[in-house]
Regions:
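N-terminal alpha-helical transmembrane segments of multi-pass membrane transport
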Residues: 1-89, 99-106, 117, 413, ...
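Membrane-interface loop-to-helix entry segments
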Residues: 36, 44-60, 166, 187-193, ...
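Helix-loop-helix module between adjacent transmembrane segments
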Residues: 40-45, 113-141, 150-187, 191-215, ...
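Transmembrane helix-loop junctions in multi-pass membrane proteins
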Residues: 47-52, 91-95, 177-190, 213-225, ...
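Flexible loop linkers connecting adjacent transmembrane helices
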Residues: 50-75, 97, 103-104, 119-161, ...
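Extracellular/periplasmic helix-exit of transmembrane alpha-helices
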Residues: 124-136, 242-258, 272, 302-305, ...
Length: 460
């Protein structure tokens, strides 16, 4: 019964809610989440006067500001945490799936989604800073959508409340989502290691869970580990991609030509035509950069910065890094490989085949290790996010923080030895519900972020 209910909710959130017919027997199927996120991104892009382009230098400047204290984080460290969760399987398997289902043109629409998603990320990151509070458990600050939703409702009701229903529902949705993602993470890692090294899933799972437990059960080890892992993995992946591009420099103009031709339906590469290209690019872009879902603000709130806008600008930059840089790296690896090399393959097998073509067996090993690092950092990042939501629901009690970490580790173990589609759907339902609650409140509270932006620009 519960499984059936989850499947129905999943279909409602992620399935095609509206189908728009197009010429040449093509159509666009639009899901509820696309209906929510794309207009929200466009709205805030207009209201911020195209912030991702106009204030890109300020994003870099905000990132360089060093203002962390003993307990709180700098804007750079919060970018590291949010990038850890954004840069995950979606940047590898997700991009592969988008190109497989929507052709090379899907890459262009992922770029577009990132540009408008940056504005949404700015607004939610700024709001997280405006409504943060002291964290007596871990030190520094905590916050996120549960907190700014709570403060908004208190203000409207004109009375203090311990909990607000919508904020509670957001926090619960987040915890459900992140537990589900834990399973997906371990399943992807063990599959990749089995393909690359022939290691049995159980062995990989035990090592993965053991390493994770050592880190997450220590008070503040998560951010310290991510400070090292995330920059190293991102730079290495980018460097390998540059090498592959230079190795195939003669085919790069044709690759970009293919991306733009297929993006606008000038060349049909997949069944479904322009509609399939457009929606696959948009959906994968939204899933990868997480803008609007309310995840990243949990990290943005932890920053110690001169102005709330600095946290917002840093999160906007995070969307750029995730989609424009890392997702594009995967796309270049895929699209510079001959079609006969990747024909008939899907998922990680497809990406590993492309890497084998470019770099031999080293490429297969490299992509397996990269997936491990991307996925492991995602797991650490989502447990950082969970801190503030657990505290909102259960108060400042270590027992509940520890119990949730143990639950996530159990889910990590289960995902490594068995694949339960139900739990994966549960994770997607969780992030879908988070998005509904968060985007709704962004329209109501977004004026605060826009006012902060106006004040920031007036003092530049």
């Amino acid at each position: 019964m519960i499984v059936l209910v989850i499947e129905k909710i999943y279909a409602f959130l992620w399935g095609d809610l509206i189908t728009i017919p197009l010429p040449q027997e093509s159509s666009i199927g639009i899901s509820l989440l696309v209906i929510l996120l794309i207009p929200t991104g466009i709205y805030f892009t207009i209201r911020t006067r195209f912030l991702p382009v106009r204030l890109f230098p300020d994003m870099i400047k905000a990132l360089m500001a060093k203002k962390e204290t003993k307990d709180s984080l700098s804007t750079f460290q919060t970018l590291i945490v949010s990038t850890a969760t954004r840069v995950g399987m979606g940047n590898l398997v997700g991009v592969v799936a988008a190109i497989s289902a929507g052709g090379a043109g899907a890459v262009f629409w992922m770029w577009v989604t990132a540009l408008i998603g940056s504005s949404t990320a700015f607004v939610e990151g700024t709001l997280a800073q405006l409504h943060k509070e002291k964290d007596p458990l871990y030190g520094g600050y905590r916050g996120g959508p549960a907190y700014y939703i709570h403060h908004f409702c208190e203000e409207k009701l004109k009375k203090k409340k311990k909990h607000v229903l919508i904020a509670v529902l957001f926090a619960i949705s987040g915890l459900i989502c992140w537990c589900g993602i834990s399973q997906v993470i371990s399943n992807s890692v063990v599959s990749s290691f089995e393909n690359a090294f022939g290691i049995p899933p159980l062995y990989t799972t035990i090592v993965l869970v053991a390493i994770a437990a050592v880190i997450v059960l220590r008070k503040n080890a998560t951010v310290k580990v991510l400070d090292v892992v995330v920059p190293v993995m991102a730079v290495c992946y980018f460097a390998i991609t540059i090498f592959i591009i230079l190795k195939n420099i003669g085919s790069i103009p044709a690759v970009f030509g293919r991306i733009f031709e297929e993006a606008f339906g000038l060349r049909q590469a997949v069944s479904g035509g322009f509609g399939a290209v457009l929606m696959n690019g948009i959906k994968r872009g939204l899933f990868s950069n997480e803008a609007g879902s309310g995840s990243a603000p949990c990290a943005a709130a932890a920053a110690e910065c001169e102005t709330p806008v600095s946290a917002g600008l840093t999160q906007a930059l995070g969307v750029f890094v995730d989609t424009i840089v890392i997702c594009s790296c995967t796309a270049m690896i895929m699209l510079t490989a001959p079609e006969n090399v990747v024909a008939g393959k899907e998922g990680m097998d497809l990406l590993q085949s492309a890497m084998r073509y470019h770099l031999g067996e080293f490429g297969v090993i490299f992509i397996a290790v990269t997936l491990f690092l991307f996925s492991f950092s995602t797991f650490l990042g989502i447990l950082f996010y969970a801190r503030s939501n657990v505290a909102y629901l259960f108060g400042d009690k270590w027992i509940f923080q520890t119990l949730y970490k143990i639950l996530a580790l159990v889910m990590l173990f289960i995902g490594g030895i068995a694949a339960y589609t139900f739990v994966w759907d549960l994770g997607d339902v969780g992030i879908g519900l988070m998005t509904i609650f968060n985007t709704g409140i962004l329209y109501l509270l977004g004026g605060q972020a826009l006012s902060a932006l106006k004040e920031f620009e007036s003092t530049k």
